[in-house]
Amino acid sequence: LDIFTVLESSRIDGYVDELYPGVMKMYEMVRLAALESRPDVTDLPAREALVEFMIRVSLGQVDEMIVPSEHKDAARKLRRLIRQVTSTDAIVEDAAEAAIRAYSILIDVKNDELEDDDYEELEDDEEDSDDSGDDEDVVDPEEVIQQFMGMAAPDGDGEGEQEDGSDEQDFEG
């Protein structure tokens, strides 16, 4: 799953939860079944473990949330993003913005293999759900895009770039 899909699914789930409470019993059964089929977080490298954490939050898990110890702050920020998009006031653009923010958090996490003792439980902090609006969470979408563009070509072949470093392309049509 990609990050946007997790966030947009969470947004829709929040909408369904609020506006259609009659379907929630069956919905919860499906969520629980989905959680049971998820991989063990401690079997995953750091970044993948945080993505799995996001999936689990989106499926409604609150207890026994295991995350890489070194990245508990990142996990809290990711959980806050998911909780913010579950508001019935949230729109698809909010999920898209949250995805950019999530990517900016995850891009700084190396996907290193970890030992079992490098993980610990993250408590359910209800203050994550309020709109604390930490300024440190504000990201420049252009900066995130540039970070991804830099990661896209790790072999550095520079294909498609002009000698002056620009990425100008000629389109005919």
Task: List where the protein language model places each region.
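Short, functionally important secondary-structure microenvironments
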Residues: 1-173
